[in-house]
Design a protein with these regions (language model features):
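Substrate-recognition/specificity elements adjacent to catalytic centers across diverse enzyme folds
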Residues: 3-177
Length: 177
């Protein structure tokens, strides 16, 4: 039988008979604890932050839509193997069940902003993965280039080539690793 135990630190431990139940429970418990945050992620993936948080985020929506996060995520779902899609669907079903449970009495953040949590589907999950990959990879390339130039030519040449390079954010050369 499936069971969930929440430890003294508030961390849920899920014991499931199969992967579908595991992913469903993971989605449900994530939404139970972080529904507002997850809703902001959902709006972000779709490039619709301004619809939830105001017109000052239109530039963010334009940026996210320019990168075609959601469009690409939809295509990615179509390229995934059926088992992976099934598990992502189970995860989304858990989230959506939690949304249904609280829909008529939403957490305070939703009431204050007068918004409803959007439903989840596999393209939101893969879109969030794409957003995170982009976010985490956005600064590594310049740092590698800076480090290579500094290691090969020295710090003075680096500053000559990149005059705006800051010593406050030094690169870590390969020999330092």
């Amino acid at each position: 039988r499936d069971s969930i135990y929440t430890d003294t630190f508030g961390v849920p431990h899920i014991f499931a008979q199969n992967e579908d139940d595991l992913f469903y429970a993971a989605g449900y418990y994530a939404a139970r604890d972080r529904l507002f945050q997850m809703s902001i992620v959902n709006f972000s993936v779709r490039g619709e932050l301004s619809s939830a948080l105001g017109d000052e985020l239109i530039d963010s929506d334009i940026y996210l839509r320019t990168w075609r996060i959601h469009d690409t995520a939809k295509k990615l779902v179509g390229e995934l193997d059926p088992q992976t899609v099934q598990l992502i669907n189970a995860f989304c079903a858990g989230i959506n069940y939690r949304i249904q449970e609280v829909y008529n009495d939403l957490p305070i953040e939703f009431k204050l902003l007068q918004i409803k949590p959007p439903a989840w589907n596999p393209s939101i999950v893969t879109g969030y993965g794409r957003m995170m990959a982009r976010e985490m990879s956005s600064s590594w390339k310049p740092e590698i280039v800076y480090g290579a130039i500094e290691n090969y030519f020295g710090k003075e040449k680096l500053k000559e080539i990149y005059p705006y390079y800051s010593d406050e954010h030094p690169t870590i050369g390969c020999s330092s690793l």
